[in-house]
Amino acid sequence: KMNFAYGGDEFFIIFYQSPTFLTYEGVQITSGNSENYTIQSLEGGNFTNNFDECKKMKTSVEKELVDLFPNLKVVYQEERKHWSDPSGLSKTITTNILFGKTYDEAGIIRINCTDWSEKIEKEKGWNDNFRVIMNSKIFNIFLLSLES
């Protein structure tokens, strides 16, 4: 079954969890809803209930990626309210590694921690998480349109 996300049928999500995964508890694939089913985003993530520990994981992975891609633009974002929570109680912190000069020019790697409010966790069944995300240019432009 395809899980269409973001209130439309442009993209769908497939989520896998397995005890055999070594690094991440789950992997999420986002694909365009076309004949080719091109992967537009690939994520690895872990569930966490400790935002401070999540930020430590984020810092560690971000250092590895910055060392791996020293010539790419890195944008460190401050901790902020998560745009998906209208109450403003959920928070997120992200580091973006851009494969171009701007967010809409090329693909991106995002290293992210999200601390959902108790209300969001109960209502939507979402969990606090740490994620490493690779987005295509197409999907990144789509996400930018949701945030504006």
Label the predicted regions.
Residues 1-36, 145-148:
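N-terminal leader/targeting segments
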Residues 1-9, 41-148:
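Non-cytosolic coordination micro-motifs
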